Regions:
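Interhelical loop and helix-boundary elements at the membrane-water interface
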Residues: 2-53, 65-169, 174-224
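Aromatic-rich transmembrane-lumenal/periplasmic boundary elements in polytopic membrane proteins
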Residues: 56-59
Length: 224
């Protein structure tokens, strides 16, 4: 047990001493905090109430992201607050941050999809996407499309766990798990090969997962 604890301690120290990886940890912690509250809130709130929250939030996020390029004051405040977690590409003129794509996907998924699917999709975005990045960047493994075997494995396994937990919590039937496994597999492939759709993963991950679940739900007349 002591050796195991020391191993994790050494790994943590090594990670935090790597500037690039430390930056990624900061990004992903922010990623989890800004996304996970959505499915958590939806567990306790009605759909109508949730949409009253999401729509103004999406407008605020998109407007801020747009005007940071147009207004010097907004740009300075934005980059002072969030500059340390942005990627280099997000500093470019007329670029959009991941928050904008997350806001767009939240509006679409929470408006159209049943509660269980929306909750599951955004827990996968918050947790699985984070694990894929952190594990994939730190653990040496073979390539899997444009990512790594380690990162994609972390994504797929964590997404399956989320799928199962959401299903148990909402008392879903076997069809949910059967089609959910297929949706998780497809989403893992899309996450590992972003050039296939060439869109931000804050958009593709929840939309691909929920679209597949909705498709099977409509074809087989399922009520998730």
């Amino acid at each position: 047990m002591t050796n195991l604890s020391q191993t994790f301690k050494d790994f943590f120290i090594h990670c935090t001493q790597d500037p690039e990886y430390k930056h990624e940890i900061q990004r992903k912690l922010f990623h989890i905090l800004t996304i996970a509250w959505l499915p958590i809130a939806y567990i306790f709130l009605a759909k109508k109430t949730m949409l009253y929250i999401i729509y103004p939030m999406a407008i605020l996020v998109i407007a801020t992201d747009f005007y940071r390029h147009k207004n010097i004051f907004i740009g300075k405040v934005f980059h002072f607050a969030f500059g340390h977690i942005l990627r280099e590409s997000e500093f470019e003129e007329n670029s959009w941050t991941g928050a904008t794509f997350m806001a767009i996907s939240a509006v679409i998924v929470f408006t159209i999809c049943p509660k269980t699917i929306a909750i599951c999709a955004f827990f996968i975005l918050a947790v699985s996407d984070c694990l894929a990045a952190l594990v994939g960047k730190k653990m040496t493994s073979k390539e899997f499309f444009e990512k790594s075997v380690a990162g994609s494995t972390a994504f797929g396994i964590s997404a399956l766990i989320i799928l199962i937990l959401c299903g148990i919590f909402n008392h879903e039937g076997l069809a949910y798990y059967f089609f959910g496994i297929f949706a998780v597999f497809a989403t893992t492939i899309i996450e590992a090969r972003p050039s296939f759709l060439d869109l931000d993963d804050n958009l593709t991950i929840p939309l691909v997962f929920s679209s597949i679940m909705m498709f099977f739900g409509l074809v087989w007349s399922l009520n998730y």
